[in-house]
């Protein structure tokens, strides 16, 4: 027969209290970890997932007609079919371009858990600052005038912009005017203004080494250098690529654009691994140069 002495009883009680306290501490620690990032969407990322033509989310489309668009030329909205809330991104084409030149980016980014509008501009000759206003109008449209299927999926506190060429210049301009944006990605950007020292929005600039329309030496690099080092920023220069690299499917542009948006729009640190220290560079790489203000 087992007899519990007062001393043994006290020991068992102490042990039970310790176990209960440890369990409570584990629960207390686990809960914040699970709730630390309510914006995290999708599976753990891999390089092959980001290089693929589409991500883990199925995508639907909605047309924004030119007649119904206020302040821009209409476009196409791409959004995940899964009911949830997502960050929203507006993308502008470049000089003489239309939404068709950036449609691949819209669908690709949406498939990673974003609502994206690829816009047409009012005229294909619109200058960068006009494109900035139109990107802003497109964000407003998604929040107020799009269908409920789109509006109900957008987290209005998490907005970003992208653009090619003069659309990239417009992206820089809007980023300088709207510090509440979560991210900006100018693609082979063009703008007469070379100084963007007032930008605080996390900015990824993608240039191309063979660009003769917006040479990196007089556009992308000065733009990047002028943004304060206190701002989260990165410069990626494509290897053996021209000004029009963003107009066709490009796995490097797709991968690092998604990683940047995930990191700063979704605050998803799972994607930091792709940005810091960043891609391999050199003759055998798709990236000629990469620099940043890591760590992010």
From Swiss-Prot:
Keywords for this protein: Disulfide bond, Hydrolase, Periplasm, Secreted, Serine esterase, Signal
Catalytic activity: (ethylene terephthalate)(n) + H2O = (ethylene terephthalate)(n-1) + 4-[(2-hydroxyethoxy)carbonyl]benzoate + H(+); a butanoate ester + H2O = an aliphatic alcohol + butanoate + H(+); cutin + H2O = cutin monomers
Localisation per UniProt entry: Secreted; Periplasm
Expression induction: Expression is not induced by the synthetic polyester poly(butylene succinate-co-adipate) (PBSA).
SUPFAM superfamilies: alpha/beta-Hydrolases
Residues covered by region (Disordered): 36-57
Binding positions (poly(ethylene terephthalate)): 95, 166, 190
Uses, biotech or industry: Has potential for application in biological recycling of plastic waste products.
Main location: secreted
EC id: 3.1.1.74, 3.1.1.101
Disulphide bridges, residue numbers: 276-294
InterPro entries: AB_hydrolase_fold (IPR029058), FrsA_esterase (IPR050261), PET_hydrolase/cutinase-like (IPR041127)
GO cellular component, one term: periplasmic space
Active site: residue positions: 165, 211, 243
Top EC class for this record: hydrolase
Consequence recorded when altering residue 64 to V: Increases thermostability and activity on pNP-butyrate
Temperature effects on activity: Optimum temperature is 50 degrees Celsius.
Pfam families: PETase (PF12740)
Subunit note: Monomer.
Role played: Catalyzes the hydrolysis of cutin, a polyester that forms the structure of plant cuticle. Shows esterase activity towards p-nitrophenol-linked aliphatic esters (pNP-aliphatic esters). Capable of degrading the plastic poly(ethylene terephthalate) (PET), the most abundant polyester plastic in the world. Can also depolymerize the synthetic polyester poly(epsilon-caprolactone) (PCL).
PANTHER family documented for this protein: DIENELACTONE HYDROLASE DOMAIN-CONTAINING PROTEIN-RELATED, POLYKETIDE TRANSFERASE AF380
Name of the featured protein: Cutinase est1
